Amino acid sequence: MTIALGKFTKDEKDLFDIMDDWLRRDRFVFVGWSGLLLFPCAYFAVGGWFTGTTFVTSWYTHGLASSYLEGCNFLTAAVSTPANSLAHSLLLLWGPEAQGDFTRWCQLGGLWTFVALHGAFGLIGFMLRQFELARSVQLRPYNAIAFSGPIAVFVSVFLIYPLGQSGWFFAPSFGVAAIFRFILFFQGFHNWTLNPFHMMGVAGVLGAALLCAIHGATVENTLFEDGDGANTFRAFNPTQAEETYSMVTANRFWSQIFGVAFSNKRWLHFFMLFVPVTGLWMSALGVVGLALNLRAYDFVSQEIRAAEDPEFETFYTKNILLNEGIRAWMAAQDQPHENLIFPEEVLPRGNAL
């Protein structure tokens, strides 16, 4: 018996190999296997948003005008959430609510679930695209890991939070002014700005912006080989092949400024990755907590003292009153189906009033 040792090679390519060759071919815009998820989902999400903001009203779900057709502009148009009565229905076009009627589907808010779900899978497809390309060119997958931060925020805010509440109605609608309304809602009903997870998110995002500005300025400041132009801007060449800045000079500069400085590029760039991604993940965790109506930082002793002593008031107690005002004024308008009526005497007023 003869045993042949060696690598097995197929004589003919099967369908998988043919698809793999075509999908991963070197072209101007890489497609890849991830593109099978990314491109259709991104196309439908963006297309659904443009369709909704252009033509579709929110009269039947929120009692609002929300399209260019009704007179909104770019800042006030939105694809709004379904009515609260529809709870967590996927609102499929062929489902029991719309029954295949496209106009009725739009009126019920079906475009919101369409955009939200295709948007989520589109973002996941983009992260998989970064994994796939990193694998192809033998890079580590830190870009994809970093992009998990925005995905975590999107999924927690647009999907997990409303799943914890009574329906998609309480998710943000897809529009600029609609997001502002949602932020006010979060503050009034959850005191979100005093939540430690929100604080970590703000520190991460603003800290990352600061690090980015400092890093870019420092690299530009420490270039030691450049063009021969008469001024900085003519001498600067963005297509320079190799890096010609001095890490040693940058280290000395910041050591003199702060007393401490990054000693190598790896630690510096890891820190620039760690700060924003951790901030985004922490804020996403905080929103998951809000989905379960968890409370954070209720300083009850100050509230009791403020209620008993007309001369005692803190910024915290003033903010609590503002939150009560947001709830009282917003709930009646934002949830008309609840028929909430607040008489004047129960509306909150601070000690100064």
Swiss-Prot record:
Its EC number is 1.10.3.9. Fe cation binds at H215, H269. The modification Phosphothreonine is found at T2. The D1/D2 heterodimer binds P680, chlorophylls that are the primary electron donor of PSII, and subsequent electron acceptors. It shares a non-heme iron and each subunit binds pheophytin, quinone, additional chlorophylls, carotenoids and lipids. There is also a Cl(-1) ion associated with D1 and D2, which is required for oxygen evolution. The PSII complex binds additional chlorophylls, carotenoids and specific lipids. GO terms for biological process: photosynthetic electron transport in photosystem II. Pheophytin a binds at Q130, N143. InterPro entries: D1/D2, Photo_II_D1/D2_sf, Photo_RC_L/M, Photo_RC_L/M_CS, PSII_PsbD/D2. The chain crosses the membrane at residues 41-61, 125-141, 153-166, 208-228, 279-295. It comes from the Eukaryota. One of its GO terms (cellular component) is photosystem II. It is a multi-pass membrane protein. Chlorophyll a PD2 binds at H198. 2 of the reaction center chlorophylls (ChlD1 and ChlD2) are entirely coordinated by water. PANTHER family: PHOTOSYSTEM II D2 PROTEIN (PTHR33149:SF12), PHOTOSYSTEM II PROTEIN D1 (PTHR33149). PSII is composed of 1 copy each of membrane proteins PsbA, PsbB, PsbC, PsbD, PsbE, PsbF, PsbH, PsbI, PsbJ, PsbK, PsbL, PsbM, PsbT, PsbX, PsbY, PsbZ, Psb30/Ycf12, at least 3 peripheral proteins of the oxygen-evolving complex and a large number of cofactors. It forms dimeric complexes. This is Photosystem II D2 protein. It comes from Jasminum nudiflorum.
